[in-house]
Design a protein with these regions (language model features):
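A cross-family phosphate/adenosyl-ligand binding-site feature
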Residues: 3, 14-99, 106
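Short beta-strand segments
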Residues: 6, 32-34, 112-115, 146-147, ...
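Short glycine-rich anion-binding loops that position phosphate/pyrophosphate groups of nucleotides
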Residues: 9, 37, 89-90, 115-118, ...
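Alpha-helix C-terminal capping segments
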Residues: 97-104, 131-142
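Glycine/threonine-rich flexible loop motifs
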Residues: 118-127
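Glycine-rich phosphate/pyrophosphate-binding loops
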Residues: 123, 137-159
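Active-site glycine-rich loop that binds ribose-phosphate moieties when present
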Residues: 126-133, 146, 159-172
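C-terminal accessory domains and tails appended to enzymatic cores
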Residues: 172-178, 184-297
Length: 297
């Protein structure tokens, strides 16, 4: 099996290092990840004549560049992974891979992650992790996004190491004939022995409130985020008259959600699996509109 891996936290993040090791047991691993942090990019791509820097890396270089220290939860499987970074969005990384490394034969699967932070509920609309998976699905490739519900750069990924291989096997052994589907897998941030199981659910609904706050270095320090992780050498300086803001916010749950909403399944101690599709048509609404807006001229 040929596997293409990417993420939106950048090649230096712990999550993608863990994922690359997990996937070695399933076949040949190629990693093409963003050079810098690209969260919230959804399916954005780098258009036009913008120059995109690409560089091959060996695994020792990846380890030296890592922005994490704890490694006890990183498995070690036989085999190696081909690593490189692209100074572009996650979806562009997949595009680049399909047009270079896999030009003659597409990979058997695209796996994006492991994301530092939940991509359940409305977060999936913004997710660069899922945007990369959607790019794979757009090309007819089975694609999976994997996330752990914590922003901690030193996160303990042992629950993903323990349970994702079985989830992956089940998903790959029961693929539908229809193309264009991605699987959004979200792990709760609890010890592996406290996880109750795996449940399928739907994309929960909600929105963020109080999203913008004036810049305070303590916000990023609390999350363990440095300017370098965001592709910056320092905090941007203000021009005259400017005020720096950062986007954080609090998630407000939609009261119409049922317990089968993916983010609520996680809250209940389950790994949630939701199926998304590149076709965003609301067919029920299309049927309703047929009798309301269709006209002949």
């Amino acid at each position: 099996m040929n596997i293409l891996i990417t993420n939106d936290d950048g090649y230096r993040a712990k999550g993608i290092r863990v994922l690359s090791e997990i996937m070695k047991q399933f076949g040949n691993v190629t990693v093409i990840a963003p050079k810098h942090h690209q969260s919230g990019m959804s399916m954005a791509v780098s258009l036009g004549l913008k120059q995109l820097a690409w560089r091959e890396l060996d695994e020792e270089e990846v380890d030296r560049a890592a922005i994490f220290r704890t490694r006890a939860d990183i498995p070690a499987y036989e085999g190696s992974a081909r690593w490189s970074y692209l100074d572009a969005t996650p979806a562009s990384c997949v595009k680049f891979g399909l047009n270079t490394c896999f030009l003659d034969n597409f990979p058997d699967v695209v796996v994006s992650g492991i994301n530092h932070g939940s991509n359940a509920a409305s977060a999936s609309c913004y997710s660069g992790t899922l945007g990369a998976a959607l790019e794979g699905a757009l090309n007819g490739i089975p694609s999976i996004g994997v996330s752990l519900d914590t922003l901690d750069p030193e996160a303990d990924f042992s629950p993903v190491v323990k349970y994702f291989p079985a989830i992956f096997r089940k998903l790959m052994s029961s693929l539908p004939e229809r193309k264009g589907i991605i699987y959004n897998v979200n792990f709760p941030d609890i010890p592996a022995d406290e996880i109750k199981g795996v449940r399928t659910g739907y994309q929960g609904r909600g929105r963020w409130v109080r999203e913008f706050k004036m810049w305070d270095p303590a916000i990023y320090a609390k999350l363990g985020i440095t300017p370098e992780m965001l592709g910056q050498s320092s905090v941007p300086k203000c021009e005259e008259g400017e005020i720096l803001y950062t986007m954080v916010g609090d998630f407000l749950d939609d009261p119409q959600n049922t317990p089968q909403a993916d983010h609520l399944l996680m809250k209940s101690g389950y790994i949630s699996v939701a199926a998304h599709n590149i076709d965003t048509t609301d067919y029920q609404e299309v049927s309703r509109l047929q009798g309301n807006v269709e006209m002949d001229f």
